[in-house]
Amino acid sequence: MVNSSAVKVVCIEDEREMIDLVQLILTRRGYEVHGALGGREGLALIEAVQPDLVLLDLMMPDMDGWEVYQQMKANEHMKSIPVIIVTAKAQSIDKVLGLHIAKVEDYITKPFGPSELLAAVTRVLHEAGIEIEGA
């Protein structure tokens, strides 16, 4: 069992406000959260930080989330990092594609509440073998 402050999360988004929101929610629970504006910056940050979890937006201008995800899974140092898709694309077909075809660990649609984000993060970390104290 680990303290949440030992858990590193990278949030890849094209909107600074969404990164700030995720940081606010997760840092209040003690997580170490790093934000990246866009896919290219996100891949570099994942390489540098080696996080325990990635929160990934799908629709970004420089490189979409599916491309980031594919590059992660093709990289020996990144392929085992769990990913939660965080996107405004709420259509059920996108959820089916994300969870079943790409094997994404979870999927949250915007807007989401703090409890929904925290529940998904806790669940995915648990499935990855990382137990959070007090969670």
Q: What is each model feature region?
A:
Residues 20-28:
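Charged docking surfaces used in two-component/phosphorelay signaling
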Residues 23, 67, 90-107, 119:
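Alpha4 helix (beta4-alpha4-beta5 surface) of REC/receiver domains from two-component response regulators
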Residues 13:
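Conserved acidic carboxylate
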Residues 111-122, 129:
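C-terminal output helix
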Residues 35-44, 65:
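Helix N-cap/capping motif at the beta->alpha junctions
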